[in-house]
Amino acid sequence: MTVYRGEVRALDRLTLTIAAGEHVAMLGPNGCGKSTFIKTLTCECYPAIEPAPFTLRIMGKDRWSVADLRQALGIVSQDLIAECTRGLSSDFAEFPRRVTGRDTVLSGFFSSIGLSPHHEVTPEMAHKADAILERLEISHLAARPLNELSSGEARRLVIARALVHEPAALVLDEVGNSLDLRAAHQLREMTRTIAQAGTAVIIVTHNLSEIIPEIDRVILLRNGRVLDDGAKEQLLTSEALTRTFDLPIEVGRHNGYFHAW
């Protein structure tokens, strides 16, 4: 499929298949089309009919309601992270002190950030939210106001929010940007917990350190196209990443994680 952002081809005849249950990392430099790929999944960008017809199929279906899509995919986009780490959605700016970590997770049922008086939280919703907080070991954040949390703590709650519908796959778009070492480590460990529990994880990033050991497959993007696609060990190499980023890069590995310099 081809997707334009203004006059620019952000995705250029992209052809890609990700199997159900597969843990994948999509890696590439800024401007390579990663965020456009996410926005296409969330229907914020639409593929062009020309130069060729396209098919966008998710979980075997090419027609989706928004509600069904949310249950199939939990997507944590850069835009959502930015909205949450500012403190609150503007829709709920009048309730800054009331929005807690638990509210943030519960708001996933209503596609909001935080809860408003017209949102009716059922006992089943409350139970699911508490179970997710406990499973991800962030129950200690449940009662704390969102606007008093660190960026890393808020991001972990936003990821928990994406899991309330028990999606088959979780898509994470640059979720580790600008975190300190401790917060980045906590986020990686939580992502590993999710992957090990059976939810497929798709990590979209330009940073090798975000690629958890559970990832088996890497897709390298450049100029809106798939430059390479294959096993992690074959593509997270100095040669492949030098070609992808157009910059001399050396790659090392330690305790299942890759790093570059």
Regions found by a protein language model. Name each.
Residues 119, 145-149, 153:
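Conserved ABC ATPase signature
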